[in-house]
Amino acid sequence: MSDTFQRIAPEQVRQLRENGAQVVDIRDPQSFAVGHISGSRHIDNHSVADFIAAADLDAPLVVVCYHGNSSQSAAAYFIQQGFSDVYSLDGGFELWRSVYPADTSSGEAE
């Protein structure tokens, strides 16, 4: 089990997603509704405990925020909670949207 997360580029996130990684978006609900990485899950302080309880701690987890800053703190938190393979998207959703505009969705979290 690793005790640190890795910062990765959008291209690496795309590859991890193709191999079944879970992507979580920690931005505010309004920003998530306007646009997010297709297939990502919105989590916040109210839903994080349920997410952790149901998650596969050994599966790769990618954390996304606005620009890649807040996701680093959240990634470190997930490591502390027992996740073994955690990544932070460098550049955040803003960079993802500029690199992969067709691989974004809109709508509220389920």
UniProtKB/Swiss-Prot annotation:
It is found in: Cytoplasm. Its main location: cytoplasm. CDD domains: GlpE_ST (cd01444). One of its GO terms (biological process) is glycerol metabolic process. One of its GO terms (molecular function) is thiosulfate-cyanide sulfurtransferase activity. Its EC number is 2.8.1.1. Transmembrane segments: none annotated. This is Thiosulfate sulfurtransferase GlpE. The gene is glpE.
